[in-house]
Amino acid sequence: MSRLEIYSPEGLRLDGRRWNELRRFESSINTHPHAADGSSYMEQGNNKIITLVKGPKEPRLKSQMDTSKALLNVSVNITKFSKFERSKSSHKNERRVLEIQTSLVRMFEKNVMLNIYPRTVIDIEIHVLEQDGGIMGSLINGITLALIDAGISMFDYISGISVGLYDTTPLLDTNSLEENAMSTVTLGVVGKSEKLSLLLVEDKIPLDRLENVLAIGIAGAHRVRDLMDEELRKHAQKRVSNASAR
């Protein structure tokens, strides 16, 4: 297969995956116990992300206090060595980060039970160490893991995934080379349902193809959810074993 051949006649992608295969997915929680109430580190393909959750805690300013629910903040820090697509205009990059933060806040405000934490603030800090496509989905997954580690109540997992459309073939969990060559969508899927908490369309996709793209994305997100659940269960078992050994 040619080095720049996105999808070969044999059905292989640039990294050797089939159209419906996920990238390598590794995650761990409670990675920064002294720096945050909840934390996670995850690698999805070449995406490497640290997520810290601080709170619920009392806000510094009374103006930030809501007597009926918690205030949720998200900050995204893109490291200079993360392969972030940088334009000559720093304003464009800043606007892109602001859009990501706004989308994440809106999504998790609907999934976190903020009403049971009135008069508090929950700060989510994300540090992107390296990225290689599908970054929004990876951010979603990192936040979900860190919130659960912090013991913050949510209605369900939210799992993120990207899907590209190459000609008429959907490609699951796209990397950056694939994203640059085709239209992509990012999904945030609630639990094992087909309910979407996020649908981000990066480019035009024919309506007659969209239903298939979404179905494949939802199925892929369910697999990501299972991988996150597996990590959480392993961590819980480890904690129980350590407690029993004392």
UniProtKB/Swiss-Prot annotation:
Q: What else is known?
A: Present with 5150 molecules/cell in log phase SD medium.
**GO CC: one term?**
nucleus
Annotated gene: SKI6
> Which domain of life does the UniProt lineage start with?
Eukaryota
Q: Where is it localised?
A: Cytoplasm; Nucleus, Nucleolus
* Keyword Iron-sulfur belongs to the record: no
Give the source species. Answer: Saccharomyces cerevisiae (strain ATCC 204508 / S288c) (Baker's yeast)
The family assignment reads: Belongs to the RNase PH family.
Listed name of the protein = Exosome complex component SKI6
Instruction: Kindly name one Pfam family recorded for this protein.
Output: RNase_PH
Which GO molecular-function terms appear in the entry?
Answer: RNA binding
This protein's record includes keyword Nucleus: yes
Q: Assembly and partners? A: Component of the RNA exosome complex. Specifically part of the catalytically inactive RNA exosome core complex (Exo-9) which may associate with the catalytic subunits RRP6 and DIS3 in cytoplasmic- and nuclear-specific RNA exosome complex forms. Exo-9 is formed by a hexameric base ring of RNase PH domain-containing subunits and a cap ring consisting of CSL4, RRP4 and RRP40.
Concerning PANTHER family, the annotation shows:
EXOSOME COMPLEX COMPONENT, EXOSOME COMPLEX COMPONENT RRP41
Which keywords does this Swiss-Prot/TrEMBL entry list?
A: Cytoplasm, Exosome, Nucleus, RNA-binding, rRNA processing
Summary of the function given for this chain in its UniProt record: Non-catalytic component of the RNA exosome complex which has 3'->5' exoribonuclease activity and participates in a multitude of cellular RNA processing and degradation events. In the nucleus, the RNA exosome complex is involved in proper maturation of stable RNA species such as rRNA, snRNA and snoRNA, in the elimination of RNA processing by-products and non-coding 'pervasive' transcripts, such as antisense RNA species and cryptic unstable transcripts (CUTs), and of mRNAs with processing defects, thereby limiting or excluding their export to the cytoplasm.
Gene3D superfamilies referenced in this protein's UniProt entry, alphabetically: GHMP Kinase, N-terminal domain
SUPFAM superfamilies reported for this sequence = Ribonuclease PH domain 2-like, Ribosomal protein S5 domain 2-like
A Gene Ontology BP annotation from the UniProt entry: U5 snRNA 3'-end processing
